[in-house]
Amino acid sequence: PAKEAKIWRGGQKALEKITLKKGLSSQDVLTLLSAEAYFDMMHLPLPQDTKGIMERFVSENLILHDEVGYSITELGALVFAKSLGDFDELKRKVVRVIVYKGKNKLETIREQVFDKGYAIGFESMVSWRNGQLPSDEEIGQALRKDARMYPEIAIRELVANMLIHQDLSEQGFPMIEIYSDR
């Protein structure tokens, strides 16, 4: 009932309206956000000057510009931050992947934290995580081939949905837990 009431109440500001850092220079913005990753992902040439980058970021609501300088929006930081840890409000939104030995949480084999903005860190997270998933080895006529127990596309979609649909007002890390059987 409490969660349902919260959903119906709504009233949360859009991510592109919430500012996390204010009064920044263009150089400060480029220190905190990855312009190279943005333009690469959008299949656009990287502008030759900082002004072109800032104009594009403003048009995409990744940053805002006013008389005191630039402000990074929560949207901009969440997807293109070089380090989410640079933003107090997002420190607990880094993705944690924990691999356990066996079928319970008694023994951790390894833990990896992915600190980059979700858009720029997603590929490396997917790659690392898929390397941790249980797999079998199929022997064909001449070659051996790794066969994942779970299709990569399904896991990729689950993780993307976890990140996109999380409640950012809730405390806690987005977490992926991997066990020997799942």
Q: What is each residue range found by the language model?
A:
Residues 1-182:
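Active-site helix-to-loop segments that bind/position phosphate- or nucleotide-bearing substrates
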